[in-house]
């Protein structure tokens, strides 16, 4: 067979391909598979990228400042000195504020270059395996007071969705006002609306429903706005908490100022105590100067240094963001230490992995990667800048032998003394080619189309570009069938391979095996009585007979040929070291059908069985097995008849559905058209008012107009109608009588309370004055004895009344 030269690009080689397998043919006769070496493939090297992500927190801070001294707490003579000190503090605060404000403005403009990413664009970007969070923040200070109590923390767990349920009075689906269709008066209303071109109750109800739908939408938007307001409140609370935390960073500076102020107050008290002594006053002034120099000046210096650090940090972020937007990694954002940490991680942990075997870094110097462009991606959220760098890893080339896979059917009784025909087996779904390294640690499969796409033979090697996939590592839990057969792993073959069975044998054939110059011979179903071996150069036995064998390997002497009914082997002239005139010799090598053996051998014994185990000129003992028979039932005609029947039923059903849908659509269109028609053309189309009335009653009751009118003016209907009218008219009278009854009852209760209060007043006067008072209950009159004037409190109004009395 001609050797095809082959080159292929393989990615992610997991093993060293320095040693090349020199086997020309790998025989697995027990499975009917042969691997014929056709070429050597080479992966031309390649580059992969290792990604690493940093999450950089955008620095936030407050501008540091020093508080002024309260000069009112000092002696009046020290006020000029205190004012001078405050002027110095104000000057330092102003200078620090201006420099930091300008730096923050420059940084904000640089951040605007990187637009904020949407949340859905950043899914899992903070959860990657290589994510490293680097916090770059500046010291913070300030004199801001806390605006929230300690327990007034924002509730981060309150994620209850807003109540967007529409109230019942806005729900258009809860309109149950259709009961009014039962009121007889509605008939007259419909009659007049149809005749005099007026909107009917149905039209008004539709308008009400539309208004309810509009109200529901407005209500929903209102609730959504309320929910948005709650969310803004939560954001403000969170911001307030953050500002309180920043405030704590300036407490040290505030305490220093407080100490200075306390020292000055102490000095003032001491100065006042010895005010009478001028020399002592001068000493105290010098002490004040020393305290200002030793306490205030260092605080001002520290404030300026802190402001300068914040300004430097803002400038570093500004330059870093500009470089980032230009496509380069900036050392101001990703420092050399951070870059060195990633490089060390790749060298120690990534490259030793089998997936990255034989891959190397382009450079271990961090400065090399700061010069590379377009090797990163970035995004920005509200408080973070996310930077991902793709570090390239390159790999040198390696070589592996490439084998063409031949699969052929083999008899169940192959290599045994059983000559009965029990069928044939064949391995299914094998690829066209497989490349395996010398240590069988890595392999790759390819198709005939990929093999034919290769071109450009150079020293026995062809280039295939990207026609072949990435090599696969050897794994006992995940293996292809072709590789399992190649390494002759019996357990893996039973797990990953599919064996096909057929009771029809192949045609006789023969193929030379390049590994040992032997021939693989199959007699086929039509077995000859014998095969002829012809050795014309032999003077001892030029012609001999050989008993055929069903799939065996046969070695034939040099200069001899083999003839059969289905094939013929030409004389062998290669690899002959001895004279061609010697005694011809034929050797048969037998193998067993491993698919049949695995059915009768335990798993423990199966590990000791190899597909290439063979006997020379000796058959194996037969295996007791019955011929496999498969029974199938011919129900094709019945299934076809059912299919036709179901197909016809489906067509009928589809036509009926289409017809019903058309009728329904026409009815809906007709009803909608009538509902929208309020013009006097309705009467014109009917021809007369009588026809319009008839059409109205027909639409409402579904009957003839005269039958409906006769039913309305029948004695039964008129009697029922009169009863309903009487009940309606009786309701106001009942309501009036009920109101009168409640009014009289209320007046009677008022009169009883008045008489009771008068009795109590009379008893009090008896106890007070010893007078005899006589009442006449029916007329509320009294006979007065021995008393001229008396005072009574009105129980209703509460006013005092003077009453004259006689004996």
Swiss-Prot record:
All ranges on the Extracellular side of the membrane: 19-704
Sites where a glycan is attached: 277, 660
Domain of life: Viruses
Membrane topology recorded in Swiss-Prot or TrEMBL: Single-pass type I membrane protein
Region (Disordered): 133-171
Cytoplasmic side: 726-807
Coiled coil: none
Stretch forming the signal peptide: 1-18
Tagged with keyword Glycoprotein: yes
Biased composition (Polar residues): 133-142
SS bonds (residue pairs): none
GO cellular component: host cell membrane; membrane
Compartment(s): Host membrane
Identification of the protein by name: Uncharacterized protein ORF54
Organism annotation: Ostreid herpesvirus 1 (isolate France)
């Amino acid at each position: 067979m001609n050797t095809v030269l082959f080159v292929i690009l393989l990615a992610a080689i997991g093993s060293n391909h320095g040693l090349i397998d020199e086997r020309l043919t790998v025989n697995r006769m027990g499975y009917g598979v042969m691997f014929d070496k056709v070429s050597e493939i080479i992966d031309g090297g390649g580059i992969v990228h290792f990604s690493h992500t940093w999450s950089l927190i955008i620095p936030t801070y407050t501008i540091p400042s020093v508080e002024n001294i309260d000069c009112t707490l000092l002696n009046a003579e020290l006020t000029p000195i205190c004012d001078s000190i405050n002027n110095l503090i104000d000057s330092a605060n102003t200078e620090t504020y201006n420099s930091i404000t300008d730096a923050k403005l420059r940084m904000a403009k640089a951040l605007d270059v990187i637009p904020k990413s949407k949340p859905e664009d950043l899914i899992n970007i903070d959860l990657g395996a290589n994510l490293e969070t680097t916090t770059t923040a500046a010291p913070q200070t300030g004199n801001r007071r806390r605006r929230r109590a300690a327990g007034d923390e924002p509730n981060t767990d309150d994620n209850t969705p807003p109540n967007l349920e529409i109230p019942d009075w806005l729900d258009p689906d809860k309109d149950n006002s259709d009961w009014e269709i039962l009121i007889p008066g509605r008939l007259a209303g419909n009659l007049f609306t149809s005749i005099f071109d007026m909107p009917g109750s149905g039209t008004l109800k539709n308008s009400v429903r539309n208004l309810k739908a509009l109200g529901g939408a407005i209500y929903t938007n209102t609730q959504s706005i309320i929910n948005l307001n709650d969310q803004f409140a939560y954001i403000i609370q969170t911001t307030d908490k953050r500002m309180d935390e920043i405030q704590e960073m300036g407490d040290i500076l505030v305490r220093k100022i407080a100490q200075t102020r306390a020292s000055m107050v102490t000095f003032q008290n001491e100065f006042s105590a010895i005010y009478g002594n001028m020399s002592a006053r001068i000493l105290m002034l010098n002490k004040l100067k020393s305290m200002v120099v030793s306490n205030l000046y260092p605080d001002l210096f520290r404030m300026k240094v802190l402001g300068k650090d914040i300004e430097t940090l803002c400038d570093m972020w500004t330059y870093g963001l500009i470089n980032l937007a230009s496509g380069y990694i900036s050392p101001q954002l990703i420092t050399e230490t951070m870059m060195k940490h990633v490089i060390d991680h790749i060298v120690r942990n990534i490259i030793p992995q089998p997936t990255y075997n034989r891959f190397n870094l382009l450079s271990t110097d961090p400065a090399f990667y700061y010069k590379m462009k377009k090797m990163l991606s970035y995004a920005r959220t509200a408080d973070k800048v996310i930077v991902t760098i793709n570090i390239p890893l390159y790999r040198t080339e390696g070589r592996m032998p490439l084998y063409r896979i031949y699969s052929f059917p083999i008899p169940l009784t192959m290599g045994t003394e059983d000559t009965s025909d029990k069928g044939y087996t064949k391995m299914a779904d094998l690829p066209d080619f497989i490349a395996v390294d010398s240590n069988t640690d890595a392999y790759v499969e390819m198709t005939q189309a990929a093999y034919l796409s290769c071109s450009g033979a150079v020293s026995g090697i062809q280039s295939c570009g990207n026609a072949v996939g990435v090599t696969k590592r050897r794994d006992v839990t995940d293996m292809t069938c072709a590789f399992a057969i190649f390494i002759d792993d019996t357990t893996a073959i039973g797990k990953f391979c599919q064996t096909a069975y057929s009771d029809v044998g192949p045609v006789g054939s023969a193929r030379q095996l390049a590994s040992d110059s032997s021939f693989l011979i199959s007699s086929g179903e039509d077995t000859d009585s014998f095969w002829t071996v012809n050795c014309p150069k032999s003077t001892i036995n030029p012609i001999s007979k050989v008993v055929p064998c069903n799939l065996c390997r046969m070695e034939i002497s040099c200069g001899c040929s083999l003839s059969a009914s289905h094939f013929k082997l030409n004389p062998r002239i290669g690899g002959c070291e001895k004279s061609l005139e010697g005694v011809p010799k034929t050797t048969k090598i037998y193998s067993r059908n491993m698919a049949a053996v695995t059915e009768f051998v335990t798993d423990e014994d199966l590990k000791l069985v190899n597909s290439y185990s063979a006997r020379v000129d000796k058959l194996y003992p037969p295996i007791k097995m019955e011929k496999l028979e498969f029974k199938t039932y011919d129900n094709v005609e019945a299934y076809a008849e059912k299919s036709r029947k179901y197909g016809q039923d489906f067509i009928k059903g589809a036509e009926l559905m289409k017809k019903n849908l058309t009728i329904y659509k026409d009815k809906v269109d007709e009803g909608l058209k009538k509902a929208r028609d309020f013009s006097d053309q309705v009467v014109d189309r009917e021809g007369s008012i009588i026809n319009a009335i008839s059409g109205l009653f027909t639409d409402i009751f579904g009957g003839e107009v005269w039958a409906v009118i006769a039913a309305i003016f029948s004695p039964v209907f008129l009697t029922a109608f009169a009863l309903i009218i009487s009940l309606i008219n009786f309701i106001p009278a009942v309501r009036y009588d009920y109101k009168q009854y409640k009014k009289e009852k209320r007046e009677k209760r008022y009169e009883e309370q008045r008489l009771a209060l008068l009795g109590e007043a009379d008893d009090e006067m008896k106890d007070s004055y010893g007078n005899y008072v006589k009442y006449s209950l029916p007329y509320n009159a009294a006979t007065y004895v021995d008393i001229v004037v008396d005072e009574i409190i009105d129980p209703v109004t509460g006013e005092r009344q003077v009453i004259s009395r006689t004996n």
